[in-house]
Design a protein with these regions (language model features):
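Membrane-embedded alpha-helical bundles of multi-pass transporters/translocases
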Residues: 2-284
Length: 284
């Protein structure tokens, strides 16, 4: 009888959790639609908005290919495996992955910041491609400068989302799905509020949307920190790391194993994102 009650309690808890997450997912979809509608209402079918979406393609591609592709395909399964076999190794892998991704994104962000104008010339000012295709290209030097400025604002976004996604994977490995699901909801909410406030009240124009992306990415990260810290401290490990020890063997066998698992998914997503970039080039 006691066993039956315990089973029923677990089923009840599971159904409640599934129900709450389902509602969250519906709200996320609704907010995503509202976000796009608000941005469209603020700028209509303007050239500025086209340039924003083109600039957004670059950080979005970096995040989707290198982080989003690896999370479900490799990182969560590896975290879950070591959670049940070697909790110390799980924490070690988390630290190393965080350092690897952070360093990579910082280096890429610096390069994107330096070569933003050249990327803009290639992406929205591809005159040779348009001549080959027989299409017109109306992107001028001012458009390319705007593209570069918008992209420079948004390049911090993949760093924030990368760390946030690793935290989300850590939470999901511990079966804490609610907070991990709450993060994209806060992202959409940050985009909506940031766009309205920065564009309408601070008169930042299209750059207000770019800063809204950064604010939304920060929301995505911050909402997960309290529960992540609680789980991490509860494991008996401190959040600080001995960086020299980690750097001495940063790409350990386990870290390389994560990227090996993620590689097929990364290649698949890369193909999809190349298609998006090509469509962006042609559309200009």
């Amino acid at each position: 009888m006691l066993l039956k009650r315990e089973t029923l309690r677990k089923i009840y808890y599971l159904l409640n959790s599934v129900g709450a997450i389902t509602v969250l997912l519906l709200v996320i979809k609704a907010l995503g639609f509202i976000k796009v509608r608000i941005i469209a209402q603020l700028f209509g079918t303007s050239r500025e908005l086209d340039i924003f979406w083109a600039a957004f393609t670059i950080p979005d591609t970096i995040f989707n290919v290198l982080v989003a592709g690896a999370i479900n395909a490799a990182i969560i399964p590896v975290f879950t495996k070591f959670l049940h076999t070697d909790a110390d190794k799980l924490r070690d892998i988390f630290k190393r992955l965080t350092i690897v991704y952070s360093l990579f994104f910082i280096i890429v962000s610096i390069l994107l910041f330096i070569f933003a104008n050249q990327i803009g010339s290639w992406l929205i000012g591809a005159d040779n491609l348009h001549k080959y295709l027989g299409t017109s290209n109306v992107a001028d030097a001012q458009n390319i400068e705007m593209f570069a400025g918008i992209m420079r604002v948004m390049i911090i976004s993949p760093i924030l989302l990368g760390i946030s996604s690793l935290m989300g994977a850590y939470l999901q490995a511990h079966k804490r799905f609610f907070t991990a699901t709450l993060a994209p909801l806060l992202y959409n909410l940050g985009m909506i509020l940031g766009s309205l406030i920065l564009v309408k009240y601070f008169n930042l124009g299209i750059y207000g949307i770019a800063w809204a992306v950064v604010i939304a990415s920060l929301f995505h990260l911050v909402v997960q920190i309290p529960e992540f810290r609680h789980l991490y401290k509860g494991s008996g490990d401190a959040l600080h790391v001995k960086f020299m020890r980690l750097f001495s063997n940063l790409f350990s066998k386990d870290i390389l194993g994560v990227f090996k698992l993620a590689l097929p998914r990364i290649i698949g997503l890369l193909g999809e994102q190349v298609n998006v970039i090509v469509n962006t080039v042609i559309s200009f």
